[in-house]
């Protein structure tokens, strides 16, 4: 599977952490500039960690398996290393991993049959609201269930090679299909629950990968999922990826945002 090597461990040279996911874009293309203005890059002490999504000027949603003790975010970026006119940097004042996510799984170096990575989402409260511009925009939470067969778009700066070792400087987009959860039940030894979405290409070649965790899954123009976990190597035939199903969590998200203005 996304061999449980937490992207944090990869980027910082640590070997004591291992997340359930390996999020990256394989088989994608360079996103058009400013086409994903809600895309966020989450950093840990200056090192790229995970993707995220701007759902409110003061709030970013990402994956709970990206949890650590220090965050900053970049908004409005296409290339992670070039000066860009729409880029905005923000510190994070508070983080709220979903209480139902089993953080102990992150520190396991091997994934076991039956491991359950449900509730893989986290809210980040920005210390200063984002300035909404042509290059930085919020995207609404879903209000209805996504339909199997929908065309979806995932994006991120994760690995562009199946082995997860070559990250992208430029934001990558990939078009994948929303599949029935039964397809992922057949594909993976870990638990696939109704709190997850299954998306990918059954023929392989297109997938998210290491480093894409926490980024958006947009189906028919609606934010429906957050990149969570998948098979390692990425993009294998009959091994679609797993995404947190946001429609299941909108009450919790709204409650956290309301209680922490």
Curated annotation (Swiss-Prot):
Q: In which tissues is it expressed?
A: High levels in pancreas, submaxillary and parotid glands, spleen, and kidney.
> What Gene Ontology cellular-component terms does the record carry?
extracellular space; secretory granule
Please name the GO terms that the record assigns under molecular function.
serine-type endopeptidase activity
Q: Where is the active site?
A: 65 (charge relay system), 120 (charge relay system), 213 (charge relay system)
- Annotated signal sequence is 1-18
Q: Which InterPro entries match?
A: Peptidase_S1_PA, Peptidase_S1_PA_chymotrypsin, Peptidase_S1A, Trypsin_dom, TRYPSIN_HIS, TRYPSIN_SER
Query: What organism is recorded for this protein?
Result: Rattus norvegicus
The uppermost taxa in this organism's lineage are: Eukaryota, Metazoa, Chordata, Craniata, Vertebrata
**Which superkingdom, per the lineage?**
Eukaryota
**Protein known as:** Kallikrein-1
What family does this chain come from, according to its entry? Belongs to the peptidase S1 family. Kallikrein subfamily.
- Residues covered by the Peptidase S1 domain: 25-258
The record ties this protein, via SUPFAM superfamilies, to:
Trypsin-like serine proteases
GO BP annotation list: regulation of systemic arterial blood pressure; zymogen activation
Q: Which cysteines are joined by disulfide bonds?
A: 31-173, 50-66, 152-219, 184-198, 209-234
Which residues does the record list as glycosylated? 108
Q: Which residues form the propeptide?
A: 19-24
Keyword line: Disulfide bond, Glycoprotein, Hydrolase, Protease, Serine protease, Signal, Zymogen
EC? 3.4.21.35
As its record notes, the protein acts as a catalyst of: Preferential cleavage of Arg-|-Xaa bonds in small molecule substrates. Highly selective action to release kallidin (lysyl-bradykinin) from kininogen involves hydrolysis of Met-|-Xaa or Leu-|-Xaa
């Amino acid at each position: 599977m996304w061999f449980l090597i937490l992207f944090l461990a990869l980027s910082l040279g640590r070997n004591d952490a291992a997340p359930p996911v390996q999020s990256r874009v394989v088989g994608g293309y360079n996103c058009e500039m400013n086409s994903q203005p809600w895309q966020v890059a989450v950093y840990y002490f200056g090192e790229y960690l995970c993707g995220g999504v701007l759902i409110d000027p003061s709030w970013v949603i990402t994956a709970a398996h990206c949890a650590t003790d220090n965050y900053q975010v970049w908004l409005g970026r296409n290339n992670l290393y070039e000066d860009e006119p729409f880029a905005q940097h923000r510190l994070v004042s508070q983080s709220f991993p979903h209480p139902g996510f089993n953080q102990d799984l992150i520190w396991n170096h091997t994934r076991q049959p039956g491991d359950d990575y449900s509730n893989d989402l986290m809210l980040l409260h920005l210390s200063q609201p984002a300035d909404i511009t042509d290059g930085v925009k919020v995207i609404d939470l879903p209000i209805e269930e996504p339909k199997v067969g929908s065309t979806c778009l995932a994006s991120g700066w994760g690995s562009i090679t199946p082995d997860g070792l070559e990250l992208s400087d430029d934001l990558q987009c990939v078009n994948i299909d929303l599949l029935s959860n039964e397809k992922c039940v057949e594909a993976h030894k870990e638990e696939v629950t109704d709190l997850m979405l299954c998306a990918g290409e059954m023929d392989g070649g297109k997938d998210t990968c290491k480093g894409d965790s926490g980024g958006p899954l947009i189906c028919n123009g609606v934010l429906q999922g957050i990149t969570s976990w998948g098979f390692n190597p990425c993009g294998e035939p009959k091994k679609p990826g797993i995404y947190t199903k946001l429609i299941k969590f909108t009450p919790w998200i709204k409650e956290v945002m309301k209680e922490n203005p």
